[in-house]
Amino acid sequence: MTFLKKNLVYVILLVVVLIFALVKPLREFVSDQFGMTATVDKVVAESSFADEDFDVDLKGMNVPDAKLSDYKGQIVFLNFWGTWCAPCRTEWPSIEALYKSKNQKVKFVLIAMQDKEEAVKKFLEENKYTAPVYIAQSPLTPKMLPDVFPTTYVIGRNLQILKKEDSTLDWNSADSQAFIDSVSK
């Protein structure tokens, strides 16, 4: 009994290691969650959108209606926001400034989420914002659907994700301007 007491930690550790080694589903779960086994195909799929992700009808709030697929083959600044979202509202002046300086190089698509048309139009008019704003009229794919607001993607001509930002950012900063310049050449 004294052997067991002295070595209890080692015995428990041995049992845990044996369980992981012998129970295949548990081993696969741990490997999937913590393992570094990404394949090139998986990395590419996770760092780019597919054609079906762009199959979204958009109702224009301050521009004509469009389809997200209209922007394939171009550099796209895609922002998900809401008038109800304080960080989104904080970010807007920098997005508007970026839009005014870079709209010849990049297509801007700002999608208001969980919002009413009247609230979006009022927000744009009160602040004199001109960046193109839409409300999605068809469901977004799980890959495109944001987890937090604001979420912004800069998407390349081949639907690759060049940048993803899950928080407020000063889009008019020198770094952001330089990034947009570098990807839009």
Feature locations, PLM:
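Structural microenvironment flanking redox-active thiols in thiol-disulfide oxidoreductases
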Residues: R89-N127, I135-K143, A178
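A short beta-strand-turn-helix
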Residues: A50, D55-V76
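Conserved redox-active cysteine motifs that mediate thiol-disulfide chemistry
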Residues: K72, F80-A97
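Structural cue for short, hydrophobic secondary-structure segments
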Residues: F77-W81, A112
